[in-house]
């Protein structure tokens, strides 16, 4: 290789990342216009386009590098020099942390995810921990109640860049003050002030004002979801001021925010104070930097592994027919491997399963589908694997495993947030907790369906319960669009004997679903059946599902709320907004 080529390659990779993040910011900056125009289908398409940008630009850089090197092979010393040059470019680079992830992605694409060593990759960052570059302007603005909270909130709202008229600004301000007074008390509120992010956070059909409520006893989140009426007027739907509420808004089961962040590390650090339960990976994920979130997630896994004496075990719950799932007992994530062979009733391919997981990545997850990170050639030390799990891996996924002696390499897996399987949760709870879980499950089904997602397999074992008590779907191998399903009523039996026959008396085609049958597997438990009939009986009617399909086909995009209906100002304070 010619001398100096290492620097050219390093510069080419960094320039490629510049191009990628520039397009990322360009797509993100269109969020305000899409919101103001109420172009919800464009919102959905922009989200998909932004997700695809990263891999597209990695591919462009890989082709450039193949041209630069004329396809010649490179030795280890050459690759180390490339990384050294790249590292020297980062100290003054504003997005150094994501640039390292981009370097990793280019390397993995070039070398087909082989030889993934710390010497060749940024397994951990080359820069000091939580180091930030000079911020050209503050991320947020402070507002003090020098003339009272009504004046303060009027200034906050007047500072917003949105160009639509407000339905009733004074009403919304009084709702916020009423909520804050109930939360803090009049005296504490008078001594508090706000710090509000300069950029709005856009997602689905809402623009979120994100801020900090700074009180004498600590800092609280201050979140205002701004929506539009059917007439295109703005209103504030609620005010959220607890870390639990903020955690759900920024949750792993929701689509990524569109927020203009030229310095993502600084924004992540600013958010950390109001989202103390979120990891660095989760914060990057929330603002749409999902590939760097994957890097941070892997680092969190390595740090945990280094500090524990645990072994991987099969994850609790009913064993899946498509995926082999394992975990570390104290770690909050699960590892999912597609089995070599599926149960006979699962007539699908591994490629189909991967396509389903990609669909979830790109779709609006409406707070009801867990996000995943996809890994190739994932290395595990044998000493960290329990004998029972090792036996299971070799039995169910041998084709995806390479034995390296002291290690194994799993060709492909997903990492996902660990939850309590809903079937286990339902066995353990009674009373109000049981009622809440069934209400949550039905709401999850409804919200997925409204977002054009049919889970396919609706058994409780395919859903999990988060630490906030939310029910989330996590088994995607039978997922499909609502519009692809044919929801049918079961025809009446022709003769009395029909109901006793082992085969149905009616024809069943691929894609046919009979909602009446849901009752058999969802209501078998006598504790659960009456709750279902009370709260979700319409889920057992085909006409309910067909009506949803019609709304989807007509282009209607449902509102998605990251909080309970009872928290909406219109419900809490009695005035309906429409």
UniProtKB/Swiss-Prot annotation:
Catalyzed reactions: L-seryl-[isocitrate dehydrogenase] + ATP = O-phospho-L-seryl-[isocitrate dehydrogenase] + ADP + H(+)
Q: What is its EC number?
A: 2.7.11.5, 3.1.3.-
Tell me where in or outside the cell this protein is found.
Cytoplasm
Q: Which PANTHER family match?
A: ISOCITRATE DEHYDROGENASE KINASE_PHOSPHATASE (PTHR39559:SF1), PTHR39559
> Which residues does the Swiss-Prot or TrEMBL record annotate as the active site?
371
**GO cellular component term of the entry, any:** cytoplasm
The alphabetical list of record keywords is: ATP-binding, Cytoplasm, Glyoxylate bypass, Hydrolase, Kinase, Nucleotide-binding, Protein phosphatase, Serine/threonine-protein kinase, Transferase, Tricarboxylic acid cycle
Similarity comment: Belongs to the AceK family.
Top-level taxon of origin: Bacteria
State one molecular function term (GO).
Answer: phosphoprotein phosphatase activity
Q: Where does ATP bind?
A: 315-321, 336
Signal sequence residues: none
Q: Which GO terms describe its biological process?
A: glucose metabolic process; glyoxylate cycle; tricarboxylic acid cycle
Please report a single Pfam family linked to this protein. AceK_kinase
Q: Which InterPro entries does UniProt cross-reference here?
A: AceK_kinase, AceK_regulatory, Isocitrate_DH_AceK
Question: Chief localization class?
Answer: cytoplasm
Protein's name according to its UniProt entry: Isocitrate dehydrogenase kinase/phosphatase
Function, as annotated, reads: Bifunctional enzyme which can phosphorylate or dephosphorylate isocitrate dehydrogenase (IDH) on a specific serine residue. This is a regulatory mechanism which enables bacteria to bypass the Krebs cycle via the glyoxylate shunt in response to the source of carbon. When bacteria are grown on glucose, IDH is fully active and unphosphorylated, but when grown on acetate or ethanol, the activity of IDH declines drastically concomitant with its phosphorylation.
């Amino acid at each position: 290789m010619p001398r100096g080529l290492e620097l050219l390659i390093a510069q080419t990779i960094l320039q490629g990342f510049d191009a990628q993040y520039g397009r990322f910011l360009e797509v993100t900056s269109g969020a305000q216009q899409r919101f103001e125009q109420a172009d919800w289908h464009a919102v959905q398409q922009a989200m998909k386009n932004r997700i695809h940008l990263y891999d597209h630009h990695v591919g462009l850089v890989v082709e450039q590098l193949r041209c630069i090197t004329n396809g010649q092979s490179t030795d280890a010393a050459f690759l180390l020099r490339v990384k050294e040059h790249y590292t020297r470019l980062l100290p003054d680079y504003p997005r150094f942390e994501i640039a390292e992830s981009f370097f990793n992605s280019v390397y993995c694409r070039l070398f087909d995810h082989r030889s993934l060593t710390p010497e060749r990759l940024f397994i951990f960052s080359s820069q000091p921990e939580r180091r930030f570059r000079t911020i050209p302007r503050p991320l947020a603005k402070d507002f003090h109640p020098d003339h009272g909270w009504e004046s303060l909130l009027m200034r906050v709202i007047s500072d917003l860049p949105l160009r639509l008229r407000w339905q009733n600004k004074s009403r919304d301000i009084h709702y916020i003050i009423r909520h804050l007074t109930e939360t803090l008390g009049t005296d504490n509120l008078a001594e508090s002030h706000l710090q509000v992010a300069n950029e709005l956070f856009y997602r689905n059909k809402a623009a979120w004002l994100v801020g900090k409520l700074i009180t004498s006893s600590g800092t609280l989140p201050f979140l205002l979801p701004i929506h539009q009426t059917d007439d295109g007027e703005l209103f504030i739907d609620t005010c959220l001021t607890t870390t639990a509420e903020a955690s759900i808004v920024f949750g792993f089961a929701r689509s990524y925010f569109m927020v203009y962040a030229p310095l993502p590390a600084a924004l992540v650090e600013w958010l950390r104070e109001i989202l103390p339960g979120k990891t660095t990976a989760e914060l990057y994920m929330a603002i749409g930097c999902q590939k760097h979130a994957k890097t941070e997630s892997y680092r969190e896994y390595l740090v945990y592994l280094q500090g524990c004496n645990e072994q991987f075990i099969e994850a609790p719950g009913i064993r899946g027919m498509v995926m082999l799932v394992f975990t570390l007992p104290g770690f909050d994530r699960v590892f999912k491997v597609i089995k070599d062979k599926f149960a006979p009733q699962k007539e699908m391919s591994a490629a189909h399963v991967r396509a389903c997981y990609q669909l979830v990545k790109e779709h609006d997850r409406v707070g009801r589908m867990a996000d995943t990170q996809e890994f190739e050639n994932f290395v595990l030390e044998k000493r960290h694997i329990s004998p029972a799990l090792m036996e299971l891996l070799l039995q169910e996924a041998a084709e995806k495993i390479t034995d390296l002696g002291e290690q194994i390499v799993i060709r492909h897996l997903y990492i996902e947030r660990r939850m309590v399987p809903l079937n286990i949760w339902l066995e353990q709870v009674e009373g109000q907790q049981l009622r809440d879980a069934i209400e949550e499950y039905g709401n999850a089904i409804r919200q997925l369906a409204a977002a054009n997602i049919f889970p396919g397999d609706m058994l409780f074992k395919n859903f999990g319960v988060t630490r906030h008590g939310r029910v989330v779907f996590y088994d995607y191998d039978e997922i499909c669009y609502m519009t692809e399903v044919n929801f049918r009523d079961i025809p009446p039996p022709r003769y009395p004997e029909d109901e006793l026959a082992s085969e149905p008396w009616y024809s069943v085609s691929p894609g046919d679903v009979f909602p009446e049958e849901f009752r058999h597997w969802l209501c078998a438990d006598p504790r659960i059946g009456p709750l279902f009939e009370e709260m979700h009986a319409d889920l057992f009617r085909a006409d309910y599902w067909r009506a949803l399909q019609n709304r989807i086909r007509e282009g209607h995009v449902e509102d998605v709320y990251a909080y309970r209906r009872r928290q909406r100002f219109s419900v809490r304070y009695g005035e309906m907004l429409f």
